């Protein structure tokens, strides 16, 4: 055939036309992925979201100080006054890999710019890796389809676009590469080649675990695959050493890393690998010593006993429970009683509408893929033609089932559903085309009918695949991935570029003492530390719950009580007691700080309440507001808030602090009551309500009614030259706009240490 036409020879390798076609398709997929992921550059070349700023700062530390210093780094600029052990609480491989590659490929470029492009490059390189993986499963055609689908998949692009210097792009690259090496190693027994691939596969999976915690969601289907393997393959002499080799290497290498280390080995991840591996070894031995007639029966009995034993281990509590987010992934109906967990936007439960928007027509081809896989399984049992071996078939199905199931818990887990559906849909589409062409060749009565069927089918498939890329307008997959970096609009609901945050952080860095402690909501901690170079109390790592709860409490106190707590020294700082972030241990150590003589004998709940009331020793308070000016320059300035800043997050402040929302908010859970305006946060908002507007007719009313929107006018309560507890020292530019349009205002107050309360 033409595709096998030999073009030239390199050594023993014959380069044929089909190889050129593969390179062309992969190059196209890589280029398309790069272009879609880079659309954010139209708004500005910045890191996106929050975590990437910490990752940039950690990478910069390695570049400047070396890897050894990184593993000894206790960051005293965050989580004041406790600090943070960076290597124990971070994605180590992300930082080490980026720093290493920067030294090789940086070529004098700025590290900040290098980290902005890093996720785009590795996210696009993953199209090649998923091609290789799916090719092992179901052939070259399926692999090429998977590469093209991966290049345009919305959930994958959203978590790997320009500036998304987080763990997912590198983690996905590593885990897909590790799985490819593992499955290509066990597909056939090739001796030393299989040995090398299995070892390398385990190594890259460990890299993925260290770079991205989400890799653990790939471990569960892998463990289930190990359980099924003795029933799927007859080459027990091979798998009895190949699988333990992978598992042993994985566990051993995991222990070398500070994270995940023993927490993975002794937790559900390690159990999901170790116990199925032990089962596989014993099951293979049982089959070896059993007669042919009793092999299946004895193996099934042992499987049942193993499952019951596993349930008993879990029920006994011998295996520690994972964190809530992993439990919630296994049980999507599990409700969180932690307001802090619920407040994270990435923890929003996935809706059917979101799933269909993210997966779109891929679901159609994934369903076709499932049908063909089950049909293939039937063919295997009947010794008919098959396109995928039983063991690969089972892993594909396990990954798909677990991926789609887990994605129903959190919206961020749509990433796993997307990868699962991509694999299934690429397999389904490749087999569909193969059967379609074969059937038309065998059944068509004449060439014209053949051609019509082929052309019509290809046209329909192309139209289906094109729909999510072009429809609907402005919210299709291509346009949806085009948005400004979070720091350019503050994470507000407005698709604008104001630059208020970069301006504010540069002002902070230039106009405040280097040892200043900035009190703010935890969302902004990474920005303040990395760009503003100032000390913060909390950030997106959410390491210490009671620290964030304390921040919420202070925001909702009256100005005098808030000022007093903000200016008081922190007892942990005075005593020099190193407190851990582990809740139980941390509370026990705090009891020694708060009650060194053990006279009070209070329990954990009272201890936590007392921690929340301890001093903070801050110097500045930062708040962020987002809203809309609704009048032009010829009219008095009126505003509507609720644009995604602290004015919108106040309901979460209240819940996290444990207060009653009815005390501070109206029935719509947004509009403030008078009690809110007496809090520190309320008084720091430089606006006052002048009435309540009806969006349907633009009328203004004096009293609140449900459905009305508060209308604000400027009103600064803490002027810069005042003698109150706080002094306004900075307001970002957009708040001064004179025309209609959005504002994304960063406001900074200096804490007046000389303030005298009025009795």
Language-model segment annotations:
Residues 191-192, 235-241, 292-300, 364-397:
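Membrane-interface helix-loop-helix junctions at transmembrane boundaries of multi-pass membrane enzymes
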Residues 269-285, 299-378, 392-393:
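Alpha-helical transmembrane segments at the extracellular/periplasmic loop-to-helix junctions
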Residues 27-33, 70-77, 118-136, 141-189, ...:
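Membrane-embedded helix bundles of polyisoprenyl
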Residues 3-8, 27, 47, 52, ...:
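Extracytoplasmic
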Residues 80, 84-96, 105-128, 161-165, ...:
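Loop-to-helix entry region of an early transmembrane alpha helix in multi-pass inner-membrane enzymes
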Residues 363, 397, 402, 407-441, ...:
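Hydrophobic/aromatic-rich transmembrane helices and adjacent perimembrane loops
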Residues 14-52, 57, 64-70, 74, ...:
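Transmembrane signal-anchor helices characteristic of membrane glycosylation enzymes that use polyprenol
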Residues 1-39, 50, 144, 282-308, ...:
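Start-transfer (signal-anchor) and selected internal transmembrane alpha helices
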């Amino acid at each position: 055939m033409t595709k096998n036409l030999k073009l030239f020879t390199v050594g023993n390798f014959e380069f044929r036309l089909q190889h050129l076609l593969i390179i062309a398709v992969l190059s196209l997929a890589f280029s398309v992925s790069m272009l879609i992921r880079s659309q954010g550059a139209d708004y500005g070349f910045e890191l996106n979201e929050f975590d990437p700023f910490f990752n940039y700062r950690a990478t910069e530390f390695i570049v400047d100080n070396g890897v050894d210093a990184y593993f000894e780094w206790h960051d005293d600029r965050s989580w004041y006054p406790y600090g943070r052990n960076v290597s124990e609480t971070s994605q180590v491989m992300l930082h080490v890999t980026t720093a290493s590659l920067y030294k090789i490929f940086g070529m004098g470029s700025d590290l900040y710019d290098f980290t902005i492009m890093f996720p785009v490059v590795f996210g696009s390189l993953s199209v090649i890796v998923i091609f290789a993986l799916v090719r092992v499963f179901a052939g070259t055609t399926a692999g090429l389809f998977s590469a093209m689908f991966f290049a345009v998949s919305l959930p994958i692009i959203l978590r790997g676009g320009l500036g998304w210097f987080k763990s997912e792009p590198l983690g996905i690259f590593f885990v897909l590469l590790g799985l490819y090496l593992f499955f290509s190693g066990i597909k056939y027994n090739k001796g030393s080649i299989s040995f090398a691939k299995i070892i390398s596969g385990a190594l890259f999976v460990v890299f993925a675990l260290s770079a991205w915690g989400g890799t653990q969601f790939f471990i569960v289907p892998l463990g289930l695959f190990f359980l099924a393997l003795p029933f799927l393959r007859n080459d027990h002499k091979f798998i009895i050493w190949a699988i333990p080799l992978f598992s042993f290497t994985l566990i051993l290498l995991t222990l070398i890393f500070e994270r995940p280390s023993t927490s993975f080995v002794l937790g559900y991840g390690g159990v999901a690998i170790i116990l199925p591996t032990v089962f596989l070894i014993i099951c293979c031995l049982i089959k070896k010593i059993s007669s042919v007639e009793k092999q299946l029966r004895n193996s099934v009995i042992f499987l049942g006993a193993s499952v019951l034993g596993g349930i008993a281990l879990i029920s006994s509590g011998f295996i520690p429970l994972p964190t809530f987010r992993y439990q919630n992934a296994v049980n999507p109906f599990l409700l969180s009683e932690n307001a802090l967990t619920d407040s994270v936007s990435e923890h929003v439960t996935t809706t059917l509408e979101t799933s269909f928007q993210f997966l779109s027509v891929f679901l159609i081809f994934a369903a076709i893929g499932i049908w063909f896989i089950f049909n293939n399984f039937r063919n295997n049992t009947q010794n008919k033609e098959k396109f995928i071996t039983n063991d690969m078939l089972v892993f594909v199905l396990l990954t798909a089932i677990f991926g789609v199931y887990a994605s129903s818990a959190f919206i961020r887990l749509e990433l796993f559903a997307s990868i699962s559906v991509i694999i299934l849909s690429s397999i389904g589409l490749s087999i569909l085309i193969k059967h379609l062409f074969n059937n038309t060749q065998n059944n068509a009565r004449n060439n014209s009918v053949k051609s019509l069927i082929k052309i019509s089918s290809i046209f329909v498939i192309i139209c289906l695949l094109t729909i999510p890329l072009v429809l609907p307008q402005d919210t299709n997959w291509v346009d949806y991935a085009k948005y400004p970096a979070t720091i350019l609009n503050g994470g507000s609901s407005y698709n604008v570029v104001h630059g208020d945050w970069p301006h504010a952080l540069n002002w902070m860095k230039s106009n405040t003492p280097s040892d200043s402690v900035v009190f703010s909501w935890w969302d902004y901690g990474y920005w303040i530390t990395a760009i503003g170079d100032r000390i913060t109390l909390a950030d997106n790592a959410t390491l210490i719950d009671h620290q964030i709860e304390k921040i919420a409490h202070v925001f909702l106190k009256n100005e005098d009580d808030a000022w007093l707590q903000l200016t008081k020294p922190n007892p942990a700082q005075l005593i020099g007691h190193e407190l851990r972030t582990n809740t139980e241990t941390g509370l026990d150590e705090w009891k020694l700080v708060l009650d060194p003589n053990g006279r009070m004998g209070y329990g954990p709940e009272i201890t936590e309440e007392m921690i929340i009331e301890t001093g903070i020793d801050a110097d500045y308070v930062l708040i962020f507001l987002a809203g809309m000016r609704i009048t032009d320059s010829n009219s008095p300035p009126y505003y509507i808030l609720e644009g995604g800043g602290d004015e919108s997050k106040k309901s979460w402040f209240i819940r996290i602090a444990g207060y009653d929302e009815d005390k501070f908010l109206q029935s719509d859970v947004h509009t403030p009551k008078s009690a809110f305006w007496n809090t520190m946060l309320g008084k720091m908002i430089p606006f006052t309500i002048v009435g309540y507007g009806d969006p349907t007719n633009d009328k203004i009313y004096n009293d609140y009614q449900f459905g009305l929107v508060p209308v604000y006018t400027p009103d600064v309560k803490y002027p810069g030259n005042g003698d109150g507890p706080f002094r306004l020292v900075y307001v970002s530019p957009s708040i001064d706009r004179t025309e209609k349009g959005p504002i994304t205002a960063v406001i900074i107050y200096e804490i007046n240490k000389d303030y005298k309360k009025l009795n």
